[in-house]
Curated annotation (Swiss-Prot):
Function recorded in the entry: Component of the BRCA1-A complex, a complex that specifically recognizes 'Lys-63'-linked ubiquitinated histones H2A and H2AX at DNA lesions sites, leading to target the brca1-bard1 heterodimer to sites of DNA damage at double-strand breaks (DSBs). The BRCA1-A complex also possesses deubiquitinase activity that specifically removes 'Lys-63'-linked ubiquitin on histones H2A and H2AX.
Keyword set, alphabetical order: Apoptosis, Cell cycle, Cell division, Chromatin regulator, Cytoplasm, DNA damage, DNA repair, Mitosis, Nucleus, Repeat, Ubl conjugation pathway
GO CC, alphabetical: BRCA1-A complex; BRISC complex; cytoplasm; nucleus
Subunit structure: Component of the ARISC complex, at least composed of uimc1/rap80, abraxas1, brcc3/brcc36, babam2 and babam1/nba1. Component of the BRCA1-A complex, at least composed of brca1, bard1, uimc1/rap80, abraxas1, brcc3/brcc36, babam2 and babam1/nba1. In the BRCA1-A complex, interacts directly with abraxas1, brcc3/brcc36 and babam1/nba1. Binds polyubiquitin. Component of the BRISC complex, at least composed of abraxas2, brcc3/brcc36, babam2 and babam1/nba1.
Name of the featured protein: BRISC and BRCA1-A complex member 2
Keyword Cell cycle carried by entry: yes
Domain notes: Contains 2 ubiquitin-conjugating enzyme family-like (UEV-like) regions. These regions lack the critical Cys residues required for ubiquitination but retain the ability to bind ubiquitin.
Gene field: babam2
Native species: Xenopus laevis
Length: 384
């Protein structure tokens, strides 16, 4: 249900509270998922005019689950705080003394409902952490992470229901990876939603039993970061080793992701250096190049009155580790399909350790040695 539809059905006196929740409601680690409202109902009589819904179900993303809590206002007394019903979490009993925004409910503050929800989620987190005490292994995992502030302060835990036969229960740890994304080139972050939310990486680790015999990790990237790193298939995290623990595994994933980000940043600066060197070495021979992401370059060159194009198209995201392809194209000869005759070359002198100037010098020398055979092939296989 869209925010507009929701607000059109809510009692006007309660609308400011609900508007803050559905428009700005981001609670917990997963900033890509907002709070949602469903099951709008009214406790008013059928004679009450206009929109009168004053109770609803609030969907809250938490540790890879969706909590569904019922919130009940009284439209006849909109200045009073709401009641809460916690659905399947019947054993969750929040401490009222810790709910300051509920005990000091301020109906003139549109954010007061959202603030109460945030306080409740904090207590819910504490409740889930306390449930881990039933498993010494899971409690060890929690306590060792808690001792490291970069993990302990950015963690959500959900302990599943007990198996009636075995007495075992599963648990999921959701951690926000302490990785700096601020230096990723801006152009890589453009192709995304208007409001992409926070740039974040979340590691979910599910323990299917209390003894950690089955552990399944999964990495979630916010849309802009996933795009910047080359898509969902670009990053493969290692399996959780048998006998390992989270305090050893999580830093490995964090370092892997940090290295990936650094490759992207370094690749951008190396591509810029590469393009600058070609501009310097080939001057007026440069036809066009990508001045934003530095991913493409086209040269128009000649050898003994034979003119040809050289395209360095789509310099790899992880350049210089990945070698670019050079495509030679005759300006005179066509293939049977009407395309300019061309040959792609990747077998040329190259080292990722060279700087941009050395790469341009080596490419220039390679052009001189390769053009005669390319010209011969163009005359033999192309059409004028």
């Amino acid at each position: 249900m869209s925010p507009e539809v929701t607000l059109n059905r809510i009692s006007p006196a309660l609308s400011p509270f609900i508007s803050s929740v559905v428009r700005n409601g981001k609670v917990g680690l997963d900033s890509t998922n907002c709070l949602r409202i469903t099951d709008l109902k009214s406790g008013c009589t059928s004679l009450t005019p206009g929109p009168s819904c004053d109770r609803f179900k609030l969907h809250i993303p938490y540790a890879g689950e969706t909590l569904k809590w019922d919130i009940i206002f009284n439209a006849s007394y909109p200045e009073l705080p709401p009641d809460f019903i916690f659905g399947e979490d019947a054993e969750f009993l929040p401490d009222p003394s810790a709910l300051h925004n509920l005990s000091e409910w301020n109906p003139s503050d549109p954010e007061c409902l959202l603030l109460v929800v945030k306080e409740l989620v904090q207590q819910y987190h504490q409740y889930q952490c306390s449930r881990l005490s039933e498993s010494s292994r899971l409690m060890f995992e929690y306590q060792t992470l808690q001792e490291e502030p970069q993990y302990g302060l950015n963690m959500e835990i959900y302990a599943g229901k007990k198996n009636n036969w075995t007495g075992e229960f599963s648990a999921r740890f959701l951690l926000k990876m302490p990785v700096d994304f601020s230096n990723i080139p801006i152009y890589l972050l453009k192709d995304s939603n208007e409001d992409p939310g926070e740039d974040v990486a979340l590691l979910s680790v599910s323990f299917e039993d209390a003894e950690a015999t089955q552990v399944f990790p999964k990495l979630f990237l916010s849309p802009r970061i996933e795009h910047a790193l080359g898509g969902s298939s670009a990053l493969h995290i290692p399996v959780f080793p048998s006998g390992s623990c989270l305090i050893d595994y999580v830093p490995q994933v964090c370092q892997l992701l940090t290295n990936k980000v650094q490759y992207v940043i370094q690749g951008y600066h190396k591509r810029r250096e590469y393009i600058a060197a070609f501009l310097s070495h080939f001057g007026t021979g440069v036809v066009e190049y990508d001045a934003e992401g530095f991913t493409k370059l086209t040269l128009l060159l000649s050898w003994k009155d034979f003119c040809f194009l050289v395209h360095t198209v789509d310099l790899p995201l992880y350049f210089p580790r990945d070698q670019p392809t050079l495509t030679f194209q005759s300006v005179y000869h066509f293939t049977n399909s009407g395309q300019l005759y061309s040959q792609a070359q990747k077998n040329y002198p190259y080292s990722p350790r060279w700087d941009g100037n050395e790469m341009a010098k080596r490419a220039k020398a390679y052009f001189r040695s390769f053009v005669p055979q390319f010209q011969e092939a163009a005359f033999a296989n192309g059409k004028l």
